[in-house]
Amino acid sequence: MENPPNETEAKQIQTNEGKKTKGGIITMPFIIANEAFEKVASYGLLPNMIMYLIRDYRFGVAKGTNVLFMWSAASNFTPLLGAFLSDSYLGRFLTISIASLSSFLGMVLLWLTAMLPQVKPSPCDPTAAGSHCGSSTASQLALLYSAFALISIGSGGIRPCSLAFGADQLDNKENPKNERVLESFFGWYYASSAVAVLIAFTGIVYIQEHLGWKIGFGVPAVLMLIAALLFILASPLYVTRGVTKSLFTGLAQAIVAAYKKRKLSLPDHHDSFDCYYHMKDSEIKAPSQKLRFLNKACLISNREEEIGSDGFALNPWRLCTTDKVEELKALIKVIPIWSTGIMMSINTSQSSFQLLQATSMDRRLSRHGSSFQVPAGSFGMFTIIALALWVILYDRAVIPLASKIRGRPFRLSVKLRMGLGLFMSFLAMAISAMVESFRRKKAISQGYANNSNAVVDISAMWLVPQYVLHGLAEALTAIGQTEFFYTEFPKSMSSIAASLFGLGMAVASLLASVVLNAVNELTSRNGKESWVSDNINKGHYNYYYWVLAIMSFINVIYYVICSWSYGPLVDQVRNGRVNGVREEEELIDIVGKGFEKEDLSPVVKTN
C-alpha cells in the first residue's frame, strides 16, 4: 500500500493544477546559468589558492595543502546535508536560493581578504636578511576560514538540487515528448558544467595570475551575484514541489529498528511472509537471507502494538518495511567497492603539489619564439579535456566500431571500467613521481637547490601525461561507480547513488590530509628536510608520489578482491547468467582475477 498524500502534498497538487503555465523551457536559462556561474566562481578559486595561502598568509606547503584538503572535504560533504534539508524541510527552490547567497557572501569575504591589508599579515620578504615575518593572527584566519565555510555551504545547496529542480520544471507526463525534453536538458546541463569548469581553469586562473588577487577574487564574486540574482528573480516562473521524507531518514529508521529488536529471534523459514511488515504492492514479501540481523527491523513482534488500523506502522523507528531493509542491505553491499574509489580521489586531490611543480618549470607552449605561458593553475584543464574526450569517443566511436566489427552489441562491463580507472590512477602517480625526480635533479644540477622560486630549464608539458591519466581514471572509475550504484540500487535510492561518489571525495580529502601529515611528521624527524618541504627543490615530492603510487597499486589489488567477492551484478542476474558470466565470456586480468568481461569475444584479451 502507498502512503496517502499528506496535507502539504495535497495542497501542492491543487496548487500545481491551477498553475500549469509555470515551469517549462523558459526556466532553463536561469537554472543552468545559476549552476554554471557557481561552478566558474568556485572552481576558479581552487587551483591557485595554495599560492595565495603561501604568499599572503605565510602558510607552509603542508599546512596550506591541509587547509585545502579540509575545504574540499567540506565542499563534498555539504551536498549530502543539502540534499537532506532540501528533500525533508526546505524544498529545492529555497535551498538553492539560500545556498546562492551563502556562496556570494563567502566570495565577498574572500575578496575582502585581498582588498583590506589589515585582514592578513603585513607584506614581508622572508628571504631578506634580518627579516622577521609574522604569521597570521587568529582573527585573520577566522575571516579566511569563514569565507571557505560559506562557499562550501553554498556548494552543498546548489549542486545536489539544481539538476533535480530543473527536471521538476520539465517533468510533464502529459507531454509525449517528455523523455526527450528531459534528455535534452540533462545534456545541456552537463555540457554547461563542463564548459564552466574549463572557463574556471583557464579564464579565472589567468586573471588571478596576471591581474592579481583583487580582481581575481572580485570576478568570481560578481559572477556569483549574477547567478543568485538570475535564479531568485525568476522565482515566479518556477514549479515548486512539496517536501517529502528523506531516504536517509528511512535508512536510519531501519538501523534503529534492527538495534531495538536485536534480542528477538528470527523465524526459521525466510518465506514466512506474515512475520514481516511490507506494503501490499511491494514485490519484497520477506527480506533476503544476507545480513540477516537487519531482518529484525521489519519483523512484526506484536501486530496490535506495532501496526495501526490503517495498516501503517505506528512507530517507523521500531518497525520498518522489507523494502527499507533491502535498501539498507544494498547500500552496505556496495561499500567495499565504493571504498576503492577513495584512493583515486586522494590522487586527484594533489593539485597543490602539481601547481608548485608547474610554477617551477618552463610553461611556454613552445620553447622557440613563444612568449605565452600557460598559467600554472590551468594545467587541470588537461584532466577535464581527457575526461570529456574519452566519454565522447567511447560513446560515439569505440562502442559503434567494436559492435560493427563483432556483429553484435559491445560494451566494457562496469566492473572492468572501474578497475581500469584505478589502474590508470596508479600509473598517473607513478609517472608523477618519475617526472618530479627528473625535475628535481635538473633543478639541483642548475644550482637551484636553495631557490624554490627559480624556473628550471624543463618544459612543464612533461606534466600533461599525468593530468591526462587522471582524467581517464575519473572517466572510467567515477562514471563507472555512479553507473554501478544506479544499477545495483533500487530506483528509490537514485538520490543516494548520485551522492555516494561525492561522499567518497569528502572522505578522500580527509584521508589525504592524514597521509600528508604522516609523511611530513615521519620524514622531518631529527632535523631532516621533510619530503613535502616548503622548498620544492630540497624536499622529495617524488618520494611522496611514490608512497601514493604504492598505495594505489595495493588499492587495485583490493578492488580485484572486492569485485570478485561482490558476485554477479543485478543486470547479469536479470539476464539469467550463470555465475555472472556467459558461456563465451572470460575473466580479464589486470593484476589478478576479478574483472568480469561482458559482451567481449574470447579472442580479445587484456593483460
Swiss-Prot record:
Deletion consequences: Nrt1.11 and nrt1.12 double mutant is defective in high-nitrate-enhanced growth.
Tissues expressed in: Expressed in shoots, stems, leaves, flowers and siliques. Mainly detected in larger expanded leaves, in the companion cells of major veins.
SUPFAM superfamilies named in the record: MFS general substrate transporter
Keyword Disulfide bond (UniProt): no
GO molecular function: low-affinity nitrate transmembrane transporter activity
Keywords: Cell membrane, Membrane, Phosphoprotein, Transmembrane, Transmembrane helix
Membrane-spanning segments: 65-85, 96-116, 138-158, 185-205, 215-235, 374-394, 418-438, 460-480, 496-516, 544-564
Subcellular location: Cell membrane
CC per GO annotation: nucleus; plasma membrane
Record-linked Pfam families: PTR2
Keyword Transmembrane tagged: yes
Membrane topology of the entry: Multi-pass membrane protein
Modified residues (Phosphoserine): S601
Gene Ontology biological process terms, A to Z: nitrate transmembrane transport
InterPro entries: MFS_trans_sf (IPR036259), POT_fam (IPR000109)
PANTHER family xref list: OLIGOPEPTIDE TRANSPORTER-RELATED
Purpose of the protein: Low-affinity nitrate transporter involved in xylem-to-phloem transfer for redistributing nitrate into developing leaves. Not involved in dipeptides transport.
Family: Belongs to the major facilitator superfamily. Proton-dependent oligopeptide transporter (POT/PTR) (TC 2.A.17) family.
Protein name per UniProt: Protein NRT1/ PTR FAMILY 1.2
Organism for this UniProt entry: Arabidopsis thaliana
Gene it is expressed from: NPF1.2
